[in-house]
């Protein structure tokens, strides 16, 4: 997460977007991948650590709802998803991952060309912050 490069805008040295292209298409795809990765990470830890299942289920559902708003969960490489082996470290690890996702969603909301997308991403960041409070 967090490695966006600013593409040249129309008239700034690069080919401009076609008149029908949505300028936020690439951003939405990147955000959807980040949310899907977070969802998979939470799900892997929920399955590996049954005593935490109830606590992690609401976070997993939040990511699924957020992904649905953007078109649905996408596949993420299984090699990038691993459950924390020690149960006592799960919540701290997920807390750090969720913090990074929250910060990225805030940055993405600023990058969005569409006001509606900016508002949606900011709302998602707030939702993640609320869930993090319970980790």
Residue ranges and their predicted role:
Residues 1-135:
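All-alpha RGS (Regulator of G-protein Signaling) helical domain and cognate RGS-like helical scaffolds
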């Amino acid at each position: 997460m967090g490695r966006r490069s600013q593409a040249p805008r129309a008239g700034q040295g690069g080919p401009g977007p076609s008149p029908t292209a949505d300028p936020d298409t690439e951003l939405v795809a990147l955000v959807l991948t980040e949310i899907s990765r977070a969802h998979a990470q939470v799900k892997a830890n929920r399955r590996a650590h049954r005593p935490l299942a109830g606590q992690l289920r609401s976070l997993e559902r939040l990511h699924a709802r957020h992904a649905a708003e953007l078109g649905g969960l996408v596949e993420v490489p299984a090699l990038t998803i691993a459950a924390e082996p020690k149960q006592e470290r799960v919540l701290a690890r997920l807390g750090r991952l969720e913090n990074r996702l929250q910060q990225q969603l805030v940055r993405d909301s600023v990058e969005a060309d569409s006001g509606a997308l900016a508002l949606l991403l900011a709302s998602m960041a707030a939702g993640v912050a609320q869930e993090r409070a319970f980790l």
